[in-house]
Swiss-Prot record:
Family matches, as InterPro entries: aa-tRNA-synth_II, aa-tRNA-synth_II/BPL/LPL, Anticodon-bd, Anticodon-bd_dom_sf, His-tRNA-ligase, HisRS-like_core, HisRS/HisZ, HisRS_anticodon
Organism encoding this protein: Ehrlichia chaffeensis (strain ATCC CRL-10679 / Arkansas)
NCBIfam families the UniProt entry points to: hisS (TIGR00442)
Molecular function (Gene Ontology), one example: histidine-tRNA ligase activity
Name recorded for this polypeptide: Histidine--tRNA ligase
Origin superkingdom: Bacteria
Cellular component, GO annotation: cytoplasm
Species lineage: Bacteria, Pseudomonadati, Pseudomonadota, Alphaproteobacteria, Rickettsiales
Length: 413
């Protein structure tokens, strides 16, 4: 095989050592907190029928138009590597006839064909939270509180801002769209090519544009709050009141719309200034019409996703493994004995390494880490039923009888 083909595919990354430990820590902590909030875990395949996403994300969304990994399998079915979790979780809800209300936690890799940059890969990882079955502001408040709680336990709140917006009900959205179209039509020729197309297909999506030519025009866009119906205004006020009651600080940002068609009403992002353009660490909102649009019952829902790579880049995590034991057998009989000893110690929860052969003591000790505990034994030790125990951290070495070995190791590890 060509050497070039042994590298990582562009936009993907191997995880080893501390990077992998950080990912595992973020997942464990998130799942633990999700359990406290009444969530149950669900796992979905990384492949879905393409229609699961095209019917829900919006035909003109960046994900559907530019970023999905699509292929036909050998039976001719159109298949997609999942670009996000929510649509797949809704499929599970409908397919398994889950009883609502229900809270679902999921995690794993997702795939989007994007230009790789800091904290933005083509394969990346998310932890995902979905709450199906409540149309009350309290559900929105609790989901935001869950995101805040996780970031708090990750010790990230010092540089995190909760930004929140309210897109409103259908009445609000329809009124605002008309005003937005009227405003943007004045600058149609100056908009990016994508935004000119979206002005016809989905003008709200323009608010999420990152194109420099669009950002300047959007500075003076009409404020959506002026178009709230009474029910929208009351709902948003209750959400903000609930956040105040929980002492969760926030900033109302009416430019947040989220990039997917299924969002409505409350939308929010937890952002940081430490990651450049990829500043959203947690993002989500309400998607009351999604389940029905996929063929299920009319089910209100709210949820969010957290980017694991982005959180990993921010946290200060020190991984500490229990100390390991290294066996140094000297002589043929000692090698045979080492096999049985290693198995016994591992069955008692102790990490054991050895190189499966008769060792030269001096050379073997040079290769042992400073934090390890070394067990040395040869013909003399086997005859006397003893073992030499050397603590590499302190340099102390002692001979102990075999029956005391487990107690001795447990005191040192």
């Amino acid at each position: 095989m060509q050497r070039d083909k042994l590298r990582e595919v562009r936009g993907t990354k191997d995880l080893l050592g501390i990077e992998l430990y950080k990912f595992q820590y973020i997942h464990r902590l998130s799942q633990s907190i999700a359990h406290r909030y009444g969530f149950i875990a669900v796992d979905t395949p990384i492949i879905e029928f393409t229609e699961v996403f095209t019917k829900t994300l919006g035909d003109d969304s960046d994900i559907v138009m530019k970023e999905m990994y699509n292929f036909q399998d050998k039976s001719g079915e159109n298949i997609t590597l999942r670009p996000e979790f929510t649509s797949a979780i809704v499929r599970v809800l409908i397919n398994k006839n889950l009883i609502i209300p229900v809270k679902l936690f999921s995690s794993g890799p997702v795939f989007r064909y994007e230009r790789p940059q800091k904290c933005r890969q083509r394969q990346f990882h998310q932890v995902n939270f979905e709450f199906f079955g409540s149309d009350l502001p309290l559900a929105d408040i609790e989901m935001i509180a869950l995101g805040y709680h996780i970031l708090d336990e990750l010790k990230l709140l010092d540089d995190i801002t909760l930004e929140i917006n309210f897109l409103g009900d259908k009445e609000t959205m329809n009124s605002y769209k008309l005003s937005l179209i009227e405003y943007l039509n004045k600058y149609k020729k100056d908009l990016s090519e994508d935004s000119q197309r979206r002005l016809i297909t989905n003008p709200l999506r323009i608010l999420d544009s990152k194109a420099p030519e669009d950002r300047e025009i959007l500075l003076n866009v009409p404020n959506i709050s002026y178009f709230y119906s009474k029910s929208s205004n009351d709902f948003f006020a209750e959400v903000l009141y609930g956040l105040d009651e929980l002492c969760i600080p926030y900033k109302v940002n009416h430019s947040i719309v989220r990039g997917l068609d299924y969002y409505c009403n409350t939308v929010f992002e937890f952002t940081t200034s430490k990651l450049g353009a990829q500043n959203a660490v947690v993002a989500g909102g309400r998607y009351d019409g999604l389940v029905k649009s996929m063929g299920g019952n009319d089910t209100p829902a709210v949820g969010f996703a957290m980017g694991v790579e982005r959180v990993s880049a921010l946290i200060d995590y020190k991984h500490q493994e229990p100390r390991s034991v290294v066996l140094i057998p000297i002589g043929k009989d000692a090698v045979s004995y080492a096999l049985k000893l290693a198995y016994e110690l591992r069955c008692n929860g102790i990490s054991v390494n050895w190189n499966y052969k008769n060792a030269n003591l001096r050379n073997a000790l040079r290769k042992v880490g400073d934090d390890n505990i070394v067990l040395i034994f040869g013909d003399e030790e086997l005859k006397n039923n003893t073992i030499q125990v050397k603590d590499m951290k302190t340099g102390e070495q002692q001979e102990i009888v075999r029956c005391d070995l487990l107690d001795t190791l447990c005191n040192k590890i």
